[in-house]
Amino acid sequence: MRVWIDADACPRAARDQVVKFALKRGFEVVLVAGQAVARPNFACVKLIVVPSGPDAADDHLVEHAVPGELVICSDVPLADRLVKKGVAALDPRGREFDERNMGERLAVRNLFTDLREQGQVGGGQAPYSEKDRQAFANALDRILTRLSR
């Protein structure tokens, strides 16, 4: 089994959590980034730096991840592409992307993009919290168990 991480947008605490699970359960972790990021020094962790460009890391993830694997990403359009391909997708705050919720997740993302462009809302997500880390660990455990069956 393999877990892919969109490393450009994934909080370090979530990446570290995936590595912890990988060491316990014996799977490979592949960090995909548009620029060099810190790679934990374990044999189970691989770093792929893709050429810079719009959506280069996303395209690499969609091209190489296969059903039965998991991708950690915050990007809703990327998650939609992965789910359509049959690849499991989870955001770093513990929310799984699937066929049942993709339409709603895309609509909310598009609404907030439009509101930001019109200057009606500002800022971004709240800082990554202990509650987020715990929700992520629980969801990660649940999905890995499901995928290993």
Curated annotation (Swiss-Prot):
This is UPF0178 protein Pmen_0294. Belongs to the UPF0178 family. InterPro entries: UPF0178 (IPR003791). It comes from the Bacteria. PANTHER family: UPF0178 PROTEIN YAII.
